């Protein structure tokens, strides 16, 4: 009986030196808010922006330094983020006003509770994420509307381009892993990334002069990650 117990308990061991790779589904749910759009420093009253929910595939690699302490790197396939106007910018004809690809790889330190040979292993983690955006595209309908705004209706043909600031964000995570055997497991985690960014829009007038607009957006997503893991 003692030998049988040892064999059984060791069948799920995730101990010091173990590596776990996980692949699964991520859902990003922004808890967003925004400041009004500013055009050349002038506030466009009752304007704002919001960000849609996103779904993507994610991968994580975890290395356990001890039976309980681990470091984890997490990255998702960058989802397409739609930004929609609110208030006076809420017209369906110009929305979403812009979209972009969001990159947000994260690095965390994690603490696993319970013994290394437990089937259920809850965990808490804290870390940092570097967030940046590329392939920023302005909706042509919004571009025409913005052109009319910045020229007081003189033209709707002034082209615009946009950029979004990169930023660092803290990451707070709670998770639970269930081990089927010494190799395979499933995990679920919920993370929170509080961060804000600014979008900058440059509109070029027919004269060649440029008009600068910007909007500050607090994104603050809650990220759910459901995954299958393999230990080696």
Feature-to-residue mapping (PLM):
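Bacterial N-terminal signal peptides
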Residues: 1-6
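Sec/Tat signal peptide C-region and signal peptidase I cleavage site
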Residues: 9-13
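Transmembrane beta-strand segments of Gram-negative outer membrane beta-barrel proteins
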Residues: 15-29, 221
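Outer-membrane beta-barrel channels and translocator barrels
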Residues: 16, 66, 78, 114-118, ...
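Hydrophobic core residues within well-ordered beta-strands of beta-rich domains
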Residues: 19, 55-57, 69, 103-105, ...
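Repeated loop/turn-to-beta-strand initiation elements of outer-membrane beta-barrel proteins
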Residues: 19, 68-71, 117, 184-186
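Residues on the lipid-exposed face of transmembrane beta-strands in outer-membrane beta-barrel proteins
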Residues: 23, 59-63, 73, 107-111, ...
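Extracellular/periplasm-exposed beta-strand and loop segments of Gram-negative cell-envelope proteins
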Residues: 29-55, 77-105, 113, 130-167, ...
């Amino acid at each position: 009986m003692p030998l049988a117990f040892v064999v059984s308990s060791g069948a799920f061991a995730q101990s010091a030196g173990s590596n776990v790779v996980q692949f699964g589904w991520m859902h990003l749910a922004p808890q967003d808010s925004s400041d009004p759009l500013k055009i050349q420093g002038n506030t466009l009253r009752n304007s704002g922006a919001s960000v849609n929910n996103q779904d993507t595939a994610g991968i994580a690699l975890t290395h356990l330094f001890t039976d309980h302490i681990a470091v984890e790197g997490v990255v998702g396939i960058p989802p397409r983020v739609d930004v929609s106007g609110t208030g006076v910018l809420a017209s369906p004809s110009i929305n979403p006003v812009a979209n972009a690809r969001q990159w947000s790889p994260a690095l965390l330190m994690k603490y696993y509770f319970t013994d290394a040979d437990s089937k259920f292993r809850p965990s808490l983690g804290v870390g940092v994420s570097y967030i940046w955006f590329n392939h920023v595209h302005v909706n042509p309908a919004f571009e025409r509307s913005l052109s009319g705004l910045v020229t007081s209706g003189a033209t709707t043909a002034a082209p615009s381009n946009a950029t979004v600031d990169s930023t660092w964000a803290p990451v707070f995570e709670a998770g639970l892993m269930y081990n089927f055997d010494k190799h395979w497991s499933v995990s679920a985690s919920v993370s929170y990334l509080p961060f804000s960014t600014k979008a900058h829009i440059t509109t070029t007038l027919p004269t060649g002069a440029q008009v600068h607009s910007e909007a500050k957006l607090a994104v603050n997503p809650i990220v759910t990650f459901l995954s299958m893991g393999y230990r080696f």
